[in-house]
Amino acid sequence: MKNLFTFLFVSSFLMGSSQMSYSSGNYASGSYSIPMTTVARGLLSENFDTTGANMTWDYSQLGMDVSGSRYSVTPASSGYQAPFITQCILAGGGFTCLTKWNSLTNIGLVDIDSLDAFVFTLYDVMTMAKKANNKLIGNVKGLKIIDSIGISIPIVAEYTSPDTILTFPFTYQDSSKSYGAWGVDLTSIGQNIQYKVTYNREWKVEGYGTLITPYQTHNNVLKVKTTLDQVDSVVFFATPLGLPRKIVEYTWYDANFE
């Protein structure tokens, strides 16, 4: 089984209204960007698993190997609205397709730049989510694939099982579980490949306190541990392949960060 560990810091451009609680209003809306560093060295000397109350997580000495940003976008600027509507119309959705898109998403969350999916690579992977009714739900996956002549083709996949990523508000020791599933069939673009992802999501607010990063210090954060027990499945020229893996994310949320 393959294990992946991710270190994230998520903040908001809105001020928090209560201490040690994070609401849907604190979460990013529309186009928003925060600085992010990819660390390639020195991780083995750091302990990301410390939990509890009034903690101090000091990662000030982490390297800044690759600088970038983690961001969200509006659905209209995601690059996946037109492919979704086109795919919906071809499936017989007609004039209801834009309405359906708007009902499924009001924010696009950039996942990763690229994803190695066995026999091919997915690019610009994005979760089109709906933030409403105190929930953040992943409903559509957007991604791109490079065809045989080097052209980037956008593809969208509506979740067969929508994924409740977060429930709001959350505070110390809150937790939740959900299940998500989505997949794509690439035969329509000349690739004899079917790719499917299924996973169980479990998250818990396992600490609060102060987070120190190479960028700055955050004095009032909630630490969330998210575990995805995931299976990636590919059918390639009628040959099924499967890879189970466990993905662990540690995320610190600061409601008072602009």
Named regions from a protein language model:
Residues M1-S24:
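Bacterial Sec-dependent N-terminal signal peptides
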Residues F9-S11, Q61, W101, L166, ...:
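Exposed boundary/loop context
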Residues L143-P240:
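Short helix-loop boundary/capping segments
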Residues V110-I146, P169-D174, Y208, T217, ...:
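Short, solvent-exposed coil/turn segments at beta-strand boundaries
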Residues Q19-I137:
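Solvent-exposed N-terminal domain segments of exported/luminal and surface proteins
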Residues A28, F237-E258:
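A short, surface-exposed beta-strand/turn
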Residues S21-N26, S31-P35, A40, S45-N47, ...:
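Ser/Thr- (and often Asn-) enriched beta-sheet segments in non-cytosolic proteins
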